[in-house]
Every structure is written in C-alpha cells, then in structure tokens.
Amino acid sequence: MSEAIKTDVLIIGAGPCGLFAVFELGLLDIKAHLIDILDKVGGQCAELYPEKPIYDIPGVPMVTGQGLTDQLMEQIKPFSPTFHLGEMVSNVEKIGDPGFRVTTDAGKVFECKVVVIAAGGGSFQPKRPPVPGIEAYEGTSVFYAVRKMEQFRGKNVVIVGGGDSALDWTLNLHPIAKRIALIHRRDDFRAAPHSVEQMRALVASGKMDLRIGQVTALEGTNGQLSAATIKGNDNAVETIPCEMMLPFFGLTMKLGPVADWGIALEHNLIPVETSAFETSVPGIFAIGDINTYPGKIKLILCGFHEGALMAQKAHRYVYPEKRLVFQYTTSSSSLQKKLGVN
C-alpha cells in the first residue's frame, strides 16, 4: 500500500458544488483534496454542457458551464486545493473518530477527518444509439456532448433525439452549421415548448430539416462521416449529408462504488439531514445532486448552500477543540487576508 496522503477533507467530485465547497472550507482554514473520475474539473457542467448557458446562478445573469467552472477555479485559488483527476474512489474505510482511509482505483491512499461526496448523479455515460458501426466514428464525427461549438461551423450536422439537449443544440448550432437535420422517432418532443416552437419555425421557413424516424446506417471513411440513412415511420428510406452527429439519448447514471461504502441509500441517492447534509455515517457528507431530503431541488445554487452548511459542521471534526466564530467576508480582515484582498 502506498504512503497515505493526509488532508483535512477529501472531496469526491470536482463539479461546481465540490469546487465551491473548497471555498467555504478554506475560509475556515480547512485544507482539501479533490478526486474526480473525469480528466478535468467542472463535472457535468464542463463535460456535457461547457458552452450551454446557465441562467439561474444568483447575481450572474448568464454564464456557460465552462465559464462557471473557470470562475470557481479562480475563486478557490487562494486555498490551493490539490486535484486527483481521472481516478475513481474504490473504498472508504473508517479508521478513527473522526477519521477515514480512502483508496482510489489508481492505488492512491488518503487519510482525512471528513469525506464530502459531491459526485453529482454518480459516474455517467451517454447512451449509445443502436446504429451499426457507430463506434468507429465516436470522438471524430459522433459526439455525445458539445465541448467546442466551433468544430460544427460550416458542417452538415445531424442531431438525434427529442429532449431538451437535442432541441437546445439544434437552436444553438443552427446559426453556425451549414445545415441542421433533427431526427426524432416521433413528432412529439419532450423539450421545453418554446424550444419546440422555435425549431418548428425554422423548419417551416426552410432553414433546417426535421425527419420523423430513426438513423439506421452511417457512411464514411477513416472515422469521418459523410452521410446518414434515415428510415421514416412510413418505412421510406432516405440518405442525407452528415459530417457530424450528436445523438442525445440520455445518460446512464451509475452510483458506482458509493453503494459499497456502508452509507444508507434511497433510490440510488444518499439521504442526508438538513442542518449540515451529513449522511448516515458521521463525518461523511453529501452535497449536490447526489443527496436527497424533503424538498430537495437539484439546482447548482442549492448545492452551494449545502456546501456552506457542510463546512460549518466539518469544522467541528477537523478542529474539535476550537470554537468556530462566524465571520463575514465583507467585514472580516482575517478572511480578506486569506482571500488576498487585504
């Protein structure tokens, strides 16, 4: 076993809630390491929606998923968190009161006073559509998320699906793509009504295509798509130009090893009490989309609130002999010094 990395708090998940938890903990002189299965920070915001606008962050009228991630990273710079990316936590073992030993699939071992699970919905992967040979084009012509809009500029783009992601990217990519074709198995969409109205208006004006049916075959060479075959609900078969494809068939969410850590679960979520969002195991907290409690709303701003209250309770485990005096960043010179603004 490798030598243990010691830290006050280990945060599992480097999405927005995990990142903001670093800030709240840092204000209380609590050091944190973060582990994430993804190869970059930002969680689903950066992985699936990096250029999609977010409108419900308080005081920020609009920010993209990547923009929010970048701003959070800037905000936590004063606390110098350490990131361990591309790793999954495989085991959490209680070794003290408080105290935990955490092991990753890369063989790293951590010892900490507090564990914070901020793993979103757990590990996730997009559902692959049942199209023969689609794997050969994944990562070059077939993408399950939009990370850089510019790569779709001037391309014939086929978007498959009928939910919010499919409609949102149809509307967002329409201005820059050569041509957008939206494919859905029925003429009934699960997306926001306003988005559906906008899409139908574009179709009616001849600015994009809508096909009711399914993609049955792909054509291309060396990973580069050139065409897609569509079989309509009337059994008519049509081949259309396709240089890029975005299938949005939803995500398969897996809680993964969390289910084996001895924490009470409820429908693949972690129940918590609401004064500090502590789990059934003292010293292990769960914040963000992975937790559940009466009245839970899955919003980023709610996860931020949960992180703030979690930090107050975590302080008791990290500094059991030290009384916590609540301070405001607007008036506390000591907090401002930590933030480098005084």
UniProtKB/Swiss-Prot annotation:
It is an enzyme of class 1 (oxidoreductase). Keywords: FAD, Flavoprotein, NADP, Oxidoreductase. It holds the Pfam family Pyr_redox_2. Gene3D superfamilies: FAD/NAD(P)-binding domain. FAD binds at residues 17, 36, 44, 49, 89, 124, 289, 330. Its cofactor is FAD. One of its GO terms (molecular function) is flavin adenine dinucleotide binding. It catalyses: 2 reduced [2Fe-2S]-[ferredoxin] + NADP(+) + H(+) = 2 oxidized [2Fe-2S]-[ferredoxin] + NADPH. The keyword Glycoprotein does not apply. Binds 1 FAD per subunit. Its EC number is 1.18.1.2. HAMAP family: FENR2. Homodimer. This is Ferredoxin--NADP reductase. It comes from Bradyrhizobium sp. (strain ORS 278).
